Regions:
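Local beta-strand N-terminus motif with an aromatic residue
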Residues: 97, 170-172, 334
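Histidine/acidic-residue-rich, glycine-tolerant segments that coordinate divalent metal ions
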Residues: 86-91, 106-114, 118-119, 135-263, ...
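Metal-dependent amide/peptide-bond hydrolase catalytic core
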Residues: 3-7, 16-17, 23, 225-423
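Divalent metal-coordination and catalytic microenvironments
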Residues: 49, 90, 101, 117, ...
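Hydrophobic/aromatic beta-strand patches that form the interior of the parallel beta-sheet core
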Residues: 99, 147, 173-175, 356-360
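Non-cysteine beta-strand/loop elements that form the S-adenosyl-L-methionine
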Residues: 100-102, 203-208, 359-364
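Acidic/His- and Gly-rich active-site-bordering loop/insert found
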Residues: 2-145
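Alpha-helical scaffold segments that flank or form the walls of functional sites
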Residues: 126-136, 161-167, 389-391, 396
Length: 423
């Protein structure tokens, strides 16, 4: 009799866990079957965006392609969302908590999708439709939303969406995944969960001088190219005194037309990165001081324009750990975190300061030594193998979202991690 009572007590104690495990398995099956069934359509969307690269805030084709696809699957897509022409939004479910999937799709000048944003869009679309099917299968309250986030490449699209109210207080999590060359992920892992990035600043500099004949009467000119070259040189010397994790990169976008005319106008662009926003701001001031000094020395005037600042990406431990565990169920061994933060910057960092956020990494095959922001990486981002990795990452994110919506304890842990990081 005692043994029977013990067994009955054991059954009572384990049944909630067994029920939860069964729900998770049901959700995984629903996500996998739904996403796999529409894979050829996802591939068409992915290939279409990849073959039509568009710069920030000009993503007309990508915007229409994704919105059309969502509507073809029975979702209502709100185009031109939050006052941005190339943003969109669609939602599934009702009541409960809310999880957002962020879809990027802008490209780079000259090299197309050298950052693989077509794959980011594909992963988030797969995550959204997969999570929507899981909500139906489980019959639980909760909402998932896909948000088109244009202009990550310097345009600060997510920052504008934050200001417009897209990431409100009722958002339990915002999720996305980014592609990375496989050789940059150590130990042959399939990706990185707790991915960290630097705060970044972008500066535009214009120098104004005076034209003159460079051979006949150079003393009558004020050389704007001298100011730009001097700025570049002094910043290069400044790099000796910056911290190892800090980055300063610059280019001369316009430096004159012909050598026999002293340039009266030149233009530069700079990127500044550091661990924190305060460090990035301080380093930016030092770069600006180089420009001001160069302008004064050459007799030019300078105009400095500051782009929307990107904040450092805050990691959410609960979201990252959940993603790692869910990728195991997809036979993907994902690294929890790398030893050092990436030197990249993203406007998802700004989102991570507003709501709990996840910015995972999935590895894609490339030629040896190929980095991001490279034409060869753009080629790799258009392969079937890269598409497959994006879709698998999407399935993982779909399960993370489902678990947040289904499990109040996990949702509380996610919120706790966010508040702890927010200080």
């Amino acid at each position: 009799m005692t043994a029977i009572l013990v067994q009955q007590q054991h059954n009572v104690e384990t049944s909630p866990k067994r029920k939860a495990d069964e729900s998770l398995q049901m959700a995984r099956r629903a996500i996998a079957s739904t996403v796999d069934a529409m894979d050829k359509h996802l591939l068409a969307v992915n290939n279409g965006i990849h073959s039509h690269p568009e710069l920030c805030y000009q993503e007309v084709f990508a915007h229409a392609t994704i919105a059309d696809f969502l509507e073809s699957q029975g979702f209502k897509a709100q185009r031109h969302a939050y006052g941005l022409d190339t943003s969109f939004e669609a939602e599934a479910g009702s009541g409960g908590r809310l999880v957002i999937f962020c879809a990027e799709y802008d490209a780079l000048p000259d090299i197309g999708h050298g950052c693989g944003h077509n794959l980011i869009a594909t992963a988030s679309i797969a995550a959204f439709v997969g999570a929507a099917s899981a909500l139906l299968a489980l019959g639980i309250a909760g909402r998932v939303r896909i948000l088109g986030t244009p202009a990550e490449e310097g345009g600060g699209g997510k920052v504008k969406l934050i200001d417009a109210g897209a990431f409100s207080d009722d958002v339990s999590a915002a999720l996305m995944c980014h592609a990375m060359p496989a050789h940059q992920v150590k130990d042959g892992k399939a990706g990185i969960a707790a991915f960290r990035t630097l705060a970044s600043r972008r500066l535009g500099m214009e120098f104004f001088g005076k034209n003159a004949h460079a051979g006949q009467e150079p003393w009558s000119g004020i050389n704007a190219l001298d100011a730009a070259v001097s700025t570049y040189t002094t910043v290069s010397m400044l790099r000796q005194q910056i911290k190892p994790h800090q980055r300063v990169q610059g280019v001369i976008e316009e430096g004159g037309k012909v050598p026999n005319i002293i340039p009266d106008y030149t233009r530069m662009a700079w990127g500044v990165r550091s661990f924190s926003s305060s460090e990035a701001d301080a380093l930016s001031e030092r770069v600006e001081a180089c420009a001001n000094g160069a302008a004064k020395a050459s007799g030019c005037t300078v105009k400095i324009t500051r782009a929307i600042p990107y904040k450092e990406l805050r990691v959410n431990e609960a979201l990252s750990a959940t993603y790692v565990s869910e990728m195991v169920s997809l036979a993907k061994d994902v690294l929890y975190e790398d030893d050092e933060p990436s030197s990249a910057g993203t406007d998802m960092g700004n989102v991570s300061h507003v709501v709990p956020s996840f910015h995972g990494i999935f590895a894609i095959p490339t030629l040896p030594g190929v980095p991001c922001h490279n034409r060869a990486f753009a080629d790799a981002a258009g392969t079937p193998e890269a598409h497959r990795e994006a879709v698998e990452a999407g399935k993982g994110m779909a399960m993370v979202a489902t678990r947040i919506l289904e499990d109040a304890d996990l949702a509380a842990k996610v919120k706790y991690d966010f508040r702890r990081r927010s200080g």
